[in-house]
């Protein structure tokens, strides 16, 4: 399968091919929204070809990407080597997270989870893309359970999701003690409904203190800065 190389806003490169979803807006915006502390242990759940892990890269972070599809993980490993950065590419099913990573071993989780229920939404062009786009291999609940398991109390997780399924995400988060602390909606313009929502949660603690940040508008100066950083 022919590969392409994407140049990321932070100067790193990403290997891709047509079997898997290529770099999109969601991963770029989530990487700008997420705020792992210095020297944090970070897990990218369902990392695919590693776009989000590479976008969020800082030399002080200890980043692990977990992915079920070996082909996608191979591309991630190649990108790690291309960039000369230190990351861990881990093959495994997040539904079996207890056999893969220790409980409470992460400070921060990032994830672009499945958008649609199985059988809903547009059909993907390949089985690999179908797995990534829909709840075919795991559900949103599987994702939140895995995130909560690896986070220590006080650890945080950041997600990007479809606004029309926000309640599904919030319900799943509440079942595993992940409390939303920051929300930000992405709009194509000032008159359009949101096309994506960014959410940061904290494991444990009070449900008070949710911050809804100002909308992020596509084609705004801030949006351009995110892509040009």
Walk through the language-model features, giving the residues of each.
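SAM-dependent Rossmann-like transferase core, predominantly class I methyltransferases
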Residues: 3-41, 47-57, 211-212
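Conserved Class I SAM-dependent methyltransferase catalytic core
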Residues: 19, 137-194
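Glycine-rich, phosphate-binding/catalytic loops in enzymes
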Residues: 31, 125-128, 175-176
């Amino acid at each position: 399968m022919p590969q392409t190389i994407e140049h990321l806003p932070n100067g790193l490169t990403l290997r891709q091919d047509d079997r898997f979803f290529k770099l999109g807006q969601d991963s770029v915006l989530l990487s700008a929204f997420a705020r792992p502390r210095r020297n944090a242990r970070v897990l990218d759940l369902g990392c695919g070809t590693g776009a989000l892990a590479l976008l969020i890269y800082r030399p002080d972070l200890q980043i692990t990407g977990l992915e079920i599809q070996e082909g996608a993980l191979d591309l991630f490993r190649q990108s790690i080597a291309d960039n000369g950065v230190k990351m861990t590419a881990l093959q495994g099913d997040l539904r079996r997270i207890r056999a893969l990573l220790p409980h409470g071993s992460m400070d921060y989780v990032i994830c672009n989870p499945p958008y649609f229920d199985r059988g809903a939404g547009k059909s993907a062009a390949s089985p690999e893309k179908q797995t990534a786009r829909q709840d075919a291999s795991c559900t949103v609940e599987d994702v939140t359970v895995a995130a909560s398991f690896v986070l220590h109390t006080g650890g945080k997780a950041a997600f990007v999701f479809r606004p029309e399924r926000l309640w599904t995400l919030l319900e799943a988060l509440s079942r595993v003690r992940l409390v939303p602390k920051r929300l930000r909606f992405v709009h194509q313009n000032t008159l359009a409904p949101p096309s994506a929502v960014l959410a940061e949660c904290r494991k444990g603690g009070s449900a008070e203190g949710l911050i809804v940040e100002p909308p992020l508008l596509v084609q705004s100066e801030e949006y351009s800065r995110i892509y040009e950083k």
